[in-house]
């Protein structure tokens, strides 16, 4: 089974905010493949499972706050015996412009607290990621930026990035090597 974890903050107050980019990508996959509703798991997450192009896939959204994402991801990886090659984390990235998508097979957190938490709990930096750009704030604080919504001008670029992230994930689900996909999508 492949597991795709979208990072975000749970609660309607955070819906459609930049920091919930990961949630928005997995929500789009769930809608497009008619996987049904996300249900609560005991591992501090909501998830939906199904078959996408012949492959069993679980889409996950931690119900912890972003900074504690590892509390959900670690137990899920253990419980479902997920090989790290079969795990992808989808997260927002301040260091990339809105509309940009980048795939990585390993690396540091880049200052992303959700990734820091996952790295700490898993004990490794070696797991696949799909990073979606949300850009640095032009004005105001980083916190207000990541917890804010995309502007009318940004939204079409963001929607295109979600679609591109979804295509990359579909290619990976279909058996494409993640490292090779980096060349195609980065």
Swiss-Prot record:
GO biological process: protein quality control for misfolded or incompletely synthesized proteins; rescue of stalled ribosome
A GO CC annotation given for this chain: cytoplasm
GO molecular function: peptidyl-tRNA hydrolase activity; tRNA binding
Signal sequence residues: none
EC main group: hydrolase
Pfam families xrefs: Pept_tRNA_hydro (PF01195)
Sequence positions that bind tRNA: 14, 65, 67, 113
Cellular compartments annotated: Cytoplasm
Record's keyword terms, sorted: Cytoplasm, Hydrolase, RNA-binding, tRNA-binding
Site, as annotated: Discriminates between blocked and unblocked aminoacyl-tRNA: 9
Enzyme Commission no: 3.1.1.29
Stored SUPFAM superfamilies: Peptidyl-tRNA hydrolase-like (SSF53178)
Site keyed Stabilizes the basic form of H active site to accept a proton: positions: 92
Catalytic-site annotation from UniProt: 19
Assembly and binders: Monomer.
Similarity comment: Belongs to the PTH family.
Function of the protein: Hydrolyzes ribosome-free peptidyl-tRNAs (with 1 or more amino acids incorporated), which drop off the ribosome during protein synthesis, or as a result of ribosome stalling.
Protein name: Peptidyl-tRNA hydrolase
Source organism of this protein record: Limosilactobacillus reuteri (strain DSM 20016) (Lactobacillus reuteri)
């Amino acid at each position: 089974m492949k597991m795709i974890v979208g990072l975000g903050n749970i609660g309607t107050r955070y819906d459609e905010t930049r920091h919930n980019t990961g949630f928005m990508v997995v929500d789009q996959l769930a809608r497009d493949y008619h996987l049904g509703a996300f249900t609560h798991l005991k591992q501090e997450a909501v998830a939906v499972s199904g078959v996408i192009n012949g492959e069993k896939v679980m889409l996950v959204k931690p119900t912890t706050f972003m900074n504690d994402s590892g509390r959900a991801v670690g137990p899920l990886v253990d419980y479902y015996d997920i090989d790290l090659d079969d795990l992808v984390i989808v997260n927002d990235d301040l260091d990339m412009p809105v509309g940009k998508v980048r795939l990585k097979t390993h690396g540091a957190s880049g200052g992303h607290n959700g990734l820091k938490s996952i790295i700490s709990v898993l004990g490794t930096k070696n797991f696949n990621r799909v990073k979606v750009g949300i850009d640095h704030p032009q004005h105001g604080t980083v916190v207000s930026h990541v917890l804010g919504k995309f502007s009318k001008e940004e939204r079409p670029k963001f929607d295109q990035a979600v679609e591109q992230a979804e295509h990359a994930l579909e290619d990976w689900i279909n058996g494409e090597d993640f490292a090779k996909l980096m060349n195609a999508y980065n």
